[in-house]
Protein backbone atom coordinates (compact mmCIF):
# COMPACT_ATOMS: atom_id res chain seq x y z
CA UNK A 1 0.00 0.00 0.00
CA UNK A 2 2.87 2.38 0.73
CA UNK A 3 4.02 2.07 -2.87
CA UNK A 4 0.53 2.84 -4.14
CA UNK A 5 0.57 6.01 -2.04
CA UNK A 6 4.01 6.89 -3.42
CA UNK A 7 2.81 6.48 -6.99
CA UNK A 8 -0.25 8.65 -6.39
CA UNK A 9 1.91 11.27 -4.70
CA UNK A 10 4.35 11.25 -7.61
CA UNK A 11 1.55 11.70 -10.11
CA UNK A 12 0.05 14.55 -8.09
CA UNK A 13 3.40 16.28 -7.71
CA UNK A 14 4.24 16.02 -11.37
CA UNK A 15 0.91 16.86 -12.91
CA UNK A 16 1.36 20.61 -12.47
CA UNK A 17 5.11 20.82 -12.14
CA UNK A 18 7.06 22.87 -14.61
CA UNK A 19 10.73 22.17 -15.07
CA UNK A 20 13.50 22.74 -17.53
CA UNK A 21 14.58 19.14 -17.03
CA UNK A 22 13.48 16.63 -19.64
CA UNK A 23 13.62 12.92 -18.85
CA UNK A 24 13.96 10.59 -21.83
CA UNK A 25 13.54 6.85 -22.18
CA UNK A 26 13.64 4.40 -25.08
CA UNK A 27 10.20 4.31 -26.69
CA UNK A 28 10.14 0.53 -27.08
CA UNK A 29 12.26 -2.54 -26.38
CA UNK A 30 11.69 -6.21 -27.17
CA UNK A 31 12.97 -9.37 -25.52
CA UNK A 32 12.16 -13.06 -25.42
CA UNK A 33 11.04 -15.09 -22.40
CA UNK A 34 14.11 -15.72 -20.25
CA UNK A 35 15.96 -12.83 -21.87
CA UNK A 36 17.47 -9.73 -20.31
CA UNK A 37 16.40 -6.21 -21.18
CA UNK A 38 17.88 -2.93 -19.92
CA UNK A 39 15.75 0.22 -19.87
CA UNK A 40 17.49 3.55 -19.39
CA UNK A 41 16.47 6.98 -18.16
CA UNK A 42 18.41 10.09 -19.17
CA UNK A 43 18.23 13.66 -17.89
CA UNK A 44 18.66 16.72 -20.09
CA UNK A 45 20.44 18.44 -17.18
CA UNK A 46 23.40 16.05 -17.12
CA UNK A 47 24.32 12.79 -15.46
CA UNK A 48 21.68 11.04 -13.38
CA UNK A 49 22.95 10.48 -9.83
CA UNK A 50 21.62 8.91 -6.64
CA UNK A 51 20.38 12.42 -5.72
CA UNK A 52 17.78 12.07 -8.49
CA UNK A 53 16.20 9.14 -6.58
CA UNK A 54 15.24 7.30 -9.77
CA UNK A 55 11.89 5.54 -9.48
CA UNK A 56 10.59 2.92 -11.87
CA UNK A 57 6.87 2.25 -12.26
CA UNK A 58 5.19 -0.49 -14.29
CA UNK A 59 1.86 0.04 -16.03
CA UNK A 60 0.01 -3.06 -17.19
CA UNK A 61 -2.53 -2.87 -20.07
CA UNK A 62 -5.42 -2.68 -17.58
CA UNK A 63 -3.88 0.56 -16.21
CA UNK A 64 -2.66 -1.15 -13.05
CA UNK A 65 0.38 0.77 -11.79
CA UNK A 66 3.03 -0.95 -9.68
CA UNK A 67 6.03 0.75 -8.10
CA UNK A 68 9.07 -1.43 -8.80
CA UNK A 69 12.15 0.54 -7.75
CA UNK A 70 12.64 3.59 -5.55
CA UNK A 71 15.74 5.59 -4.68
CA UNK A 72 17.65 4.28 -7.71
CA UNK A 73 18.07 0.67 -6.55
CA UNK A 74 15.61 -0.17 -3.76
CA UNK A 75 13.19 -2.89 -4.84
CA UNK A 76 9.66 -2.44 -3.51
CA UNK A 77 8.28 -5.17 -1.25
CA UNK A 78 6.92 -8.10 -3.24
CA UNK A 79 8.67 -7.13 -6.48
CA UNK A 80 10.45 -10.12 -8.04
CA UNK A 81 14.25 -10.15 -7.88
CA UNK A 82 14.43 -10.20 -11.69
CA UNK A 83 13.82 -6.42 -11.53
CA UNK A 84 16.84 -4.36 -10.46
CA UNK A 85 17.67 -0.67 -10.54
CA UNK A 86 21.09 0.90 -10.96
CA UNK A 87 23.09 3.68 -12.54
CA UNK A 88 24.83 2.85 -15.82
CA UNK A 89 27.16 5.59 -17.00
CA UNK A 90 25.21 8.85 -16.87
CA UNK A 91 21.76 7.20 -16.82
CA UNK A 92 19.46 5.38 -14.44
CA UNK A 93 18.65 1.85 -15.52
CA UNK A 94 16.06 -0.82 -14.90
CA UNK A 95 17.23 -4.33 -15.73
CA UNK A 96 14.81 -7.21 -16.17
CA UNK A 97 16.75 -10.48 -15.98
CA UNK A 98 14.91 -13.61 -17.02
CA UNK A 99 11.95 -11.75 -18.49
CA UNK A 100 8.53 -13.37 -18.31
CA UNK A 101 5.54 -12.80 -20.56
CA UNK A 102 3.79 -11.06 -17.65
CA UNK A 103 6.52 -8.36 -17.81
CA UNK A 104 5.04 -7.13 -21.11
CA UNK A 105 4.07 -3.60 -20.02
CA UNK A 106 4.90 0.11 -20.04
CA UNK A 107 7.68 1.24 -17.70
CA UNK A 108 8.03 4.81 -16.51
CA UNK A 109 11.07 6.43 -14.94
CA UNK A 110 10.73 9.43 -12.62
CA UNK A 111 13.69 11.57 -11.52
CA UNK A 112 13.80 14.04 -8.64
CA UNK A 113 14.83 17.64 -9.36
CA UNK A 114 15.03 19.97 -6.34
CA UNK A 115 11.40 19.77 -5.24
CA UNK A 116 9.49 17.57 -7.66
CA UNK A 117 9.70 14.48 -9.84
CA UNK A 118 9.81 14.61 -13.63
CA UNK A 119 8.54 11.59 -15.55
CA UNK A 120 9.91 10.14 -18.75
CA UNK A 121 7.55 9.24 -21.57
CA UNK A 122 7.74 5.54 -20.80
CA UNK A 123 9.22 2.48 -22.47
CA UNK A 124 6.96 -0.22 -23.92
CA UNK A 125 8.56 -3.58 -23.23
CA UNK A 126 7.31 -6.44 -25.38
CA UNK A 127 8.11 -9.97 -24.27
CA UNK A 128 7.64 -12.20 -27.31
CA UNK A 129 6.17 -15.56 -26.49
From Swiss-Prot:
One of its GO terms (cellular component) is immunoglobulin complex. InterPro entries: Ig-like_dom, Ig-like_dom_sf, Ig-like_fold, Ig_sub, Ig_V-set, IgV_Light_Chain. Residues 1-19 form the signal peptide. The keyword Signal applies. Keywords: Adaptive immunity, Immunity, Immunoglobulin, Pyrrolidone carboxylic acid, Signal. Pfam families: V-set. SMART domains: IG (SM00409), IGv (SM00406). The modification Pyrrolidone carboxylic acid is found at residue 20. Residues 20-125 form the Ig-like domain. GO terms for biological process: adaptive immune response; immune response. This chain is from a myeloma protein with anti-DNP activity. This is Ig lambda-2 chain V region MOPC 315. It comes from Mus musculus (Mouse).
